[in-house]
UniProtKB/Swiss-Prot annotation:
Transmembrane segments: none annotated. NCBIfam families: PRK08881.1. Belongs to the universal ribosomal protein uS14 family. Binds 16S rRNA, required for the assembly of 30S particles and may also be responsible for determining the conformation of the 16S rRNA at the A site. Part of the 30S ribosomal subunit. Contacts proteins S3 and S10. This is Small ribosomal subunit protein uS14A. Pfam families: Ribosomal_S14. GO terms for molecular function: rRNA binding; structural constituent of ribosome. Keywords: Ribonucleoprotein, Ribosomal protein, RNA-binding, rRNA-binding.
């Protein structure tokens, strides 16, 4: 499980990105890169790192399910993810 501080930091960055999204888009469309550079670094969507929604793990993230491979495997074996079943061929 990820540290609580890292999970909180990611949420804070996501909030900052949402706050400045319209302003960033307008500045980019106008080509005003000097004003764009004055915005906070965390206002850029590139700074967001995807994390597991259950425990905050940053690696081995599956976008389709919003969780890491470890939690995906555990929940899939338990039959708790709709539409997912063990393959057999």
């Amino acid at each position: 499980m990820a540290k609580k501080s890292k999970i909180a930091k990611e949420k804070r960055i996501e909030a900052t990105v949402a706050k400045y999204a319209e302003r960033r888009q307008a500045l980019k469309a106008a080509g005003n890169y000097t004003e764009l550079a004055k915005l906070p670094r965390n206002a850029s969507p590139v700074r967001i790192h995807r994390r597991d929604s259950l425990d905050g793990r940053p690696h081995a993230y599956l976008r389709k399910f919003g969780m890491s491979r470890l939690n995906f495997r555990r929940l899939a074996h338990a039959g708790q993810i709709p539409g997912v079943k063990k393959a057999s061929w």
